[in-house]
Design a protein with these regions (language model features):
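Active-site helix of classical SDR
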Residues: 31
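A short helix-coil junction within the Rossmann-fold of NAD(P)-dependent oxidoreductases
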Residues: 1-5, 19
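Rossmann-fold scaffold of SDR-type NAD(P)-dependent oxidoreductases
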Residues: 11
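Active-site-adjacent segment of SDR/Rossmann-fold oxidoreductases
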Residues: 19-20, 41-51
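Residue(s) in the substrate-gating loop at a strand-loop-helix junction
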Residues: 14
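Short-chain dehydrogenase/reductase
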Residues: 109, 122-132
Length: 157
């Protein structure tokens, strides 16, 4: 891509890579946050060569993610988590086949996004993913405002 001075790198992340906060998905979310940090840094490195990057944050799409063949739930090893773990595992199992996102529509949307000029640096896919992103933005704004005075008073006098 550098040689031809053009290209487009698309990474599929997750809504959990943008706004985590679900019980028992810390390792998954960490992997997605890592992917996103890498992509955001990569964007600055490759943009001078005409290479674009896009992070895709899909919400819940009706894929094989929650099927028994695709998902293994770890056995509980810490009793402190048992009261939350059981109901959550049952919830996830109940959602298989009920996810609101249509993967065929997502595929068509990704083709549209890939053909935009310039393509977006981020595509948040699905109404649930947008709602999560908007909540994350609101949470960040509230955290900034809660400590704005303290935070902005840290420069040398």
């Amino acid at each position: 891509m550098r040689k031809q001075r053009s290209g487009h790198i698309v990474s599929i992340s997750s809504s959990a890579g943008l706004a985590a906060g679900f019980d028992f998905v810390s390792a998954y979310a960490a992997s997605k946050f890592g992917l996103e940090g890498w992509m955001e840094s990569l964007q600055a490195e490759v943009a001078p060569f005409g290479i674009h990057t896009t992070i895709v944050n899909p919400g819940f799409f009706r894929t094989e993610l929650l099927t028994e063949q695709s998902t293994d739930y770890a056995e509980s090893s810490i009793a402190d988590y048992d009261d939350r773990r059981g109901p959550l595992v049952e919830y996830w199992k109940s959602q298989n086949g009920r996810q609101s996102g249509d993967p065929a529509k997502l595929a068509r949307a990704l083709v549209t996004v890939a053909n935009q000029n310039p393509p977006p640096r981020r595509f948040i896919a699905g109404a649930d993913a947008i709602a999560g992103a908007e909540q994350k933005i609101a949470d960040l704004r509230a955290q900034i405002e809660a400590n704005r005075e303290l935070s902005t008073a840290l420069a040398f006098d």
